[in-house]
A protein has these predicted regions:
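Intrinsically disordered, low-complexity linker/terminal regions across diverse proteins
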Residues: 21-230
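Bacterial Sec-dependent N-terminal signal peptides
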Residues: 1-23
Length: 230
């Protein structure tokens, strides 16, 4: 069976990602962030639909109980703004010190009876910074990805962090990560280099790779071109 994965990739603390995609299922892997003025503050879901009638959807925190799954109603004149967390590491945000391991208690799966748009927005760093991402839904599922980020030129700050997150949509999904042969990378919570092979994920589980830019010269562009396959 070909197993599909969902992936997000980001530069520094956050990066905007295009237009949202209509879908009945949205996978939201965990994010992470740099320290200091990139610390996450308030975090929100923005959910809408072009459908005239009421559309029921459910937000399922990965690793949560049935009691923690919450249902909402949305229609084309009544979008929803839903608070995820007031600040800090949360169901959405993962401490970079805990990345590079299989994670089964971060991120979300959102299921709807009809198509919806899903985006996440947040403030950070004493409200001096903000970020957003949009979910591509089922259209973002695949078995092969290449990671791309901006170049980190000049004098990067201590809070600069490159990362990507992978979430499995099926049980017993094997993930392999290989980069573009940049040597001397310092990967958060991981003592070796790429390739990182045979990561086994069940549905909803995720794996995040993070590089603090100031840890090594290679970390500036160390994720560009990384191949993610399942």
């Amino acid at each position: 069976m070909i197993r599909k994965i969902f992936i997000f990739f980001f530069l520094l603390a956050f990066v905007n990602k295009g237009l949202a995609q209509l879908s009945k299922v949205h996978y939201i892997p965990p994010l992470t962030s740099g320290p200091s003025n990139a610390d996450p503050l308030d975090q929100w879901f923005y959910i809408s639909t072009p459908i005239n009638g009421d559309v029921s959807f459910k937000i399922k925190p990965v690793g949560g109980t049935l009691d923690e799954e919450i249902s909402y109603i949305v229609n084309n004149s009544n979008p929803k703004k839903i608070l995820i967390a007031n600040d800090g590491y949360s169901q959405l945000f993962q401490d970079p010190a805990t990345t590079s391991v299989v994670t089964n208690n971060k991120g979300y799966i959102i299921e709807s009876q009809d198509v919806i748009y899903v985006s996440v927005r947040m403030n950070a760093g004493g409200n001096a910074q903000a970020g957003a991402l949009v979910s591509k839904g089922d259209n973002a599922l695949g078995q092969l990805f290449r990671i791309g980020t901006y170049d980190n030129k000049g004098n990067p700050g201590n809070n600069y962090l490159n990362f990507f997150s992978v979430m499995a949509t099926e049980n017993q999904t094997t993930i392999n990560l290989s980069n573009n042969n940049i040597a001397g990378l310092v990967i958060q919570n991981y003592s070796e280099q790429f390739p990182i092979n045979n990561i086994i994920l069940n549905k909803g589980e995720s794996y995040t790779v993070a590089l603090k830019v100031t840890d090594s010269e290679g970390n500036r562009d160390g994720l560009i071109g990384t191949l993610v396959s399942s």
